[in-house]
């Protein structure tokens, strides 16, 4: 009898065990689509990014012109650039929904998978930040200046660290060239981390909406979830292409159409929309070091969620108090995002401070308390 190549070939066997014969819970919902959507985002970004890198020049005198040249003179260069810029937004939409799913359904109890996921988020944020500097527009330059300057808040070594990162005494040509190198490298680091993420995930298997073990009721990934994922791909790519074709600058900052000028500061320096919630937390503390610590904590707090799980139920499906807190947290992050886009003046300052305070309070104090209370109420 001939061997089944798919199940016996060393490399095909790995693909088979991850994408074809993978035992998957029979009841996972569309919220479980975002992992594969993130994979598609990553592939799209690497392909479009590679095509852009072929025409880009990492030099302060030429960077802005090289991007303009791409959009005007390269075949479909405008489309590739628009797909790449808006693809980053979709990447963040998917990752935030993916993390929200993990928080709601208790997926963070797969600790290794969760921790690698948080590291992936940090790497993605670093990649997006260095990428935003490359077109060398006003917001690129000033964003790079403001955000890298935050490291100077680190006691004793801060200033040295910043000048080392800049490669000089201000953001200049050495900064741009190293940011381009990093922006090229980091997506491949993300690919490597993704494989580690999947390795740990397939060690335990996927969680499911009920948060209970589903070993007795597993179905093969293919064809059931391959077809479901393909529907997700089609929907997301349709949205991405629509945004890139109809309204490519909707999520960008008009300030970035002006070439970088160190002598003129833009009236409102703000990052891309996907960093605004963290930026609002940074601004809500009137002390530089305190703000930087709060900024770091806003993401690093995710490492603590598995340790703060006090409920005897894994998922929030049957926990109404935790559900109310969860959706309050979602609304809170949206408020932070809005405040981050507003100027630093009354009433935005106090709104930002209240929203920042409640962000940490919900995650660190109210979630564990509500879960403990629910254990009592449900007599668990």
UniProtKB/Swiss-Prot annotation:
In this chain, a ubiquinone is annotated as bound at 202
Which Gene3D superfamilies does its entry note? Cytochrome Bc1 Complex, Chain C (1.20.810.10)
Going by the UniProt record, its keywords in alphabetical order are: Electron transport, Heme, Iron, Membrane, Metal-binding, Mitochondrion, Mitochondrion inner membrane, Respiratory chain, Transmembrane, Transmembrane helix, Transport, Ubiquinone
Residues engaged in binding heme b b566: 98, 197
List where in the cell it is found.
Mitochondrion inner membrane
Does the keyword Heme belong to this entry? yes
Cofactor(s) the protein needs: heme b
Q: Which GO terms describe its biological process?
A: mitochondrial electron transport, ubiquinol to cytochrome c
Pfam families tied to this protein: Cytochrom_B_C, Cytochrome_B
Q: What else is known?
A: Heme 1 (or BL or b562) is low-potential and absorbs at about 562 nm, and heme 2 (or BH or b566) is high-potential and absorbs at about 566 nm.
* Quaternary structure note: The cytochrome bc1 complex contains 11 subunits: 3 respiratory subunits (MT-CYB, CYC1 and UQCRFS1), 2 core proteins (UQCRC1 and UQCRC2) and 6 low-molecular weight proteins (UQCRH/QCR6, UQCRB/QCR7, UQCRQ/QCR8, UQCR10/QCR9, UQCR11/QCR10 and a cleavage product of UQCRFS1). This cytochrome bc1 complex then forms a dimer.
Task: Outline what the protein does.
Answer: Component of the ubiquinol-cytochrome c reductase complex (complex III or cytochrome b-c1 complex) that is part of the mitochondrial respiratory chain. The b-c1 complex mediates electron transfer from ubiquinol to cytochrome c. Contributes to the generation of a proton gradient across the mitochondrial membrane that is then used for ATP synthesis.
The protein's name? Cytochrome b
């Amino acid at each position: 009898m001939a061997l089944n190549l798919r199940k016996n070939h060393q490399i095909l066997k790995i693909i088979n065990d991850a994408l074809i014969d993978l035992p998957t819970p029979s009841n996972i919902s569309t919220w479980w689509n975002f992992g594969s959507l993130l994979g598609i985002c990553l592939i799209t970004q690497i392909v479009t990014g590679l095509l852009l890198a072929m025409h880009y020049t990492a030099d302060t005198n030429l960077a802005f012109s090289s991007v303009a040249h791409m959009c005007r003179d390269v075949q479909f260069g405008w489309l590739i650039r628009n797909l790449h810029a808006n693809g980053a937004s979709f990447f963040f939409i998917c990752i935030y929904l993916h993390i929200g799913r993990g928080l709601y359904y208790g997926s963070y109890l797969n600790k290794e998978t969760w921790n690698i996921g948080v590291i992936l988020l940090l790497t993605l944020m670093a990649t997006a930040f260095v990428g935003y500097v490359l077109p060398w527009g006003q917001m690129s330059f000033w964003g790079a200046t403001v955000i890298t300057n935050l490291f100077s808040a680190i006691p004793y070594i801060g200033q040295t660290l910043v000048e080392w990162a800049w490669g000089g005494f201000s953001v200049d040509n050495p900064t741009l060239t190293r940011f381009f190198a990093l922006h090229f490298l980091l997506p491949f680091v993300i690919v490597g981390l993704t494989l580690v993420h999947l390795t740990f995930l397939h060690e335990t298997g996927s969680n499911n909406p009920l948060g209970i073990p589903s070993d007795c009721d597993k179905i093969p990934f293919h064809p059931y979830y391959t077809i479901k994922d393909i529907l997700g791909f089609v929907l997301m790519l349709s949205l991405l292409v629509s945004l890139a074709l109809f309204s490519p600058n909707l999520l960008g900052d008009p300030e970035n159409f002006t070439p970088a000028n160190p002598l003129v500061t833009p009236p409102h320096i703000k990052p891309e929309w996907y960093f605004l919630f963290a930026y609002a937390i940074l601004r809500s503390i009137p002390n530089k070091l305190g703000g930087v610590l709060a900024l770091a904590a806003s993401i690093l707090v995710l490492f603590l969620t598995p340790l703060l799980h006090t409920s005897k139920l894994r998922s929030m499906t049957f926990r109404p108090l935790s559900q109310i807190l969860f959706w309050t947290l979602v609304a809170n992050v949206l408020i932070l995002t809005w405040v981050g886009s507003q100027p630093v003046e009354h009433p935005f300052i106090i709104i930002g401070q209240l929203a920042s305070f409640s962000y940490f309070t919900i995650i660190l104090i109210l979630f564990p308390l509500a879960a403990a209370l629910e254990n009592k109420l449900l007599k668990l």
